[in-house]
Amino acid sequence: MQTYLVGGAVRDQLLNLPVKDRDWVVVGATPEQLLSLGYQQVGRDFPVFLHPKTKEEYALARTERKSGAGYTGFICDFSPHISLEQDLIRRDLTINAIAQDNQGKFIDPYEGISDLKNRTLRHISPAFAEDPLRVLRVARFAARYHQLDFSIAPETIALMAEITEKGELQQLTIERVWQETEKALKEKNPEIYFQVLLQVGALKILFPELYALYGVPNPAQYHPEIDSFLHTMLVLQQAVRLTENTEFNKSAVRFAAICHDLGKALTPKDILPHHYGHEKAGIQPIRTLSNRLKVPTYYKELAEFTCEYHSYIHKAFELKPETVIKLFNKLDVWRKPQRFEELMLVCVADTRGRTGFEQTAYPQKDYLRQLYQTALQVNVQQVIEDGFEKQGIRDELTRRRTIAVKTKKAEILPRFVGQ
């Protein structure tokens, strides 16, 4: 019985990146042997065990043979005679098929180390096509390692496109699609994930609402990048920069960024490149996308609010105090202050997600935050003590908050408009 460190731990070690989880493969053993050594079996479809002390995962070396559609139709053989090389070849990419023995020696039968040096994501064998989820996984790896100048091998791109064309992606469960997408949103370059999916034809199938933005023009005066899909990817880039090293819900903000302009795909062709009313028009595509992929409610709500109100927020200096309070009420910022801050981040990203506007200031954020903080100072308890009841409490709160915002606006607006 021999154990080898495999997968991401070896790959990231060779890239001088922090190693998060360590996975092991066991060659020449049976489930009974591992159980007798105190390992705990957790794998349902094939034997995976937890080490009695470290709780790290140890899997018996196995081969997989395609037996049906999708990514679950496999027959596994995990008998003791399966070699390390046989186990490694079933993996997706060469860079994920490097093993390390107990002496620190690397076993690299499929030239993964060479591909790491050349910054190439390359599939190991034609068996890659047997698991359509790998199309999304490779797109996600491209997003993760883009900062290290990795690119996908042309033959792997071609195979991903072939898998897509054959309709294999339709076999994926929505849970797995969202799981891969949410992971991609947490990477440093999530826009690469969507661009790769576009390149191989998968975006149209999995994210038709986002794909519909491709080729839809914007006025060049405000959007030198012109294309609505490209603008959305630039906004996503900016959202990443704005949410790094913050306590905000990064994935929710980034999801809102990719959804904020979905309504532009529905703009009547005769009024292009203008997009009057795209804010309201975008609500339904967001709901359709979110419901189909079972996106978390918090993400969906933030995306909808961003879509509907981002243009209002861009014009914050023109809003009447009554409109500002109405906006705050709709966002329920009194109970959800984080939502206010996250919405502001997407609006900043929207402004900067345009070619040549990457460093643009966004004073609307500080202006609205000051109005918000002023409105927060209106004391609910005082309203109740003044004798108001039920609906009267809410009406009086709105009245007092509006007065407070009106006073604050008169005080600070000249300073902001003069910037």
Swiss-Prot record:
Residues 228-334 form the HD domain. Its cofactor is Mg(2+); Ni(2+). ATP binds at residues 8, 11, 91, 137, 140. PROSITE patterns: HD. The keyword Hydrolase applies. One of its GO terms (biological process) is RNA repair. CTP binds at residues 8, 11, 91, 137, 140. Mg(2+) binds at residues 21, 23. It holds the Pfam family HD. Keywords: ATP-binding, Hydrolase, Magnesium, Metal-binding, Multifunctional enzyme, Nickel, Nucleotide-binding, Nucleotidyltransferase, RNA repair, RNA-binding, Transferase, tRNA processing. It catalyses: a tRNA precursor + 2 CTP + ATP = a tRNA with a 3' CCA end + 3 diphosphate; a tRNA with a 3' CCA end + 2 CTP + ATP = a tRNA with a 3' CCACCA end + 3 diphosphate. Belongs to the tRNA nucleotidyltransferase/poly(A) polymerase family. Bacterial CCA-adding enzyme type 1 subfamily. Catalyzes the addition and repair of the essential 3'-terminal CCA sequence in tRNAs without using a nucleic acid template. Adds these three nucleotides in the order of C, C, and A to the tRNA nucleotide-73, using CTP and ATP as substrates and producing inorganic pyrophosphate. tRNA 3'-terminal CCA addition is required both for tRNA processing and repair. Also involved in tRNA surveillance by mediating tandem CCA addition to generate a CCACCA at the 3' terminus of unstable tRNAs. While stable tRNAs receive only 3'-terminal CCA, unstable tRNAs are marked with CCACCA and rapidly degraded. NCBIfam families: PRK10885.1. PANTHER family: MULTIFUNCTIONAL CCA PROTEIN. A single active site specifically recognizes both ATP and CTP and is responsible for their addition. Comprises two domains: an N-terminal domain containing the nucleotidyltransferase activity and a C-terminal HD domain associated with both phosphodiesterase and phosphatase activities. HAMAP family: CCA_bact_type1, CCA_bact_type2. This is Multifunctional CCA protein. It comes from Mannheimia succiniciproducens (strain KCTC 0769BP / MBEL55E).
